[in-house]
Swiss-Prot record:
This is Outer-membrane lipoprotein carrier protein. GO terms for biological process: lipoprotein localization to outer membrane; lipoprotein transport. Monomer. SUPFAM superfamilies: Prokaryotic lipoproteins and lipoprotein localization factors (SSF89392). Residues 1-18 form the signal peptide. It comes from the Bacteria. Gene3D superfamilies: Lipoprotein localisation LolA/LolB/LppX. CDD domains: LolA (cd16325). Keywords: Chaperone, Periplasm, Protein transport, Signal, Transport. GO terms for cellular component: outer membrane-bounded periplasmic space. NCBIfam families: lolA. The gene is lolA. It is found in: Periplasm.
Length: 200
């Protein structure tokens, strides 16, 4: 489930920020607006509050405005997540189950989904600042934080910090910006003979 939350946080960060320092907000907004699509390989680590690694994942992701996400983690923890702006499908081949969520509900619960979301209303609950070559997006009440780092105007590192101190770090490699990605990439066909849990 941590992979689901983090991937959905990815699917929100392309858009408009409504709080925080105005110059930091505008700078981050400008960087994010330049990105209409993004494809990359990733390495993800989940760490506890002491920095101990709890989980390591790798895979590929694709993002496309306005709200499309494809996220595929490799074995041994293989999973696939597809979001099309309305629904999110999370497929775990090991347990042979597909869970379907309403994407708007995921946006409300996850700061990372702010990257793609074209509705700036969610940003009213976040502050944005820039220091140490990173943008920090912090929820005003629940303490969750999102850190975004860009290299040559490409998003290359994302860290999500939960209020209790757990960190999820995502390093992006072989980043390709604004290449054509077919809408078919964001269509999920439920495999035969799997359980479906529709929470949408």
């Amino acid at each position: 489930m941590k992979a689901v939350v983090f991937a959905m946080v990815m699917a929100v960060s392309f858009n408009v920020f409504a709080s925080g320092d105005e110059s930091d907000k505008q700078a981050l907004q400008s960087l994010l607006k330049q990105t209409q699509s993004l494809s990359a390989e990733f390495e993800q680590q989940v760490k506890d509050e002491q920095g101990e690694v709890l989980q390591t994942l790798s895979g590929t992701l694709k993002l496309k405005r306005p709200a499309n996400l494809y996220w595929h983690t490799k074995e041994p923890d293989e999973s696939v997540m597809v979001a099309n702006g309305k629904k999110v499908w999370y497929y775990n081949p090991f347990v042979e189950q597909v869970t379907i969520y309403a994407q708007q509900d995921m946006v409300d619960d996850s700061p990372l989904l702010l990257v793609l979301n074209s509705n700036g209303n969610q940003w009213q609950n976040y502050n944005v600042s820039f220091r140490d070559n990173r943008y920090f997006v912090e929820h005003q009440t629940n303490g969750s934080k999102l850190e975004l780092r860009f290299t040559d105007e490409k998003l290359t590192e994302i860290t999500m910090v939960q209020a209790q101190g757990e960190r999820t770090e995502l390093m992006l490699n072989n980043v390709a910006l604004n290449e054509t990605i077919s809408d078919e990439q964001f269509v999920f066909d439920v495999p035969a003979d799997v359980d479906v849990d529709d929470q949408s």
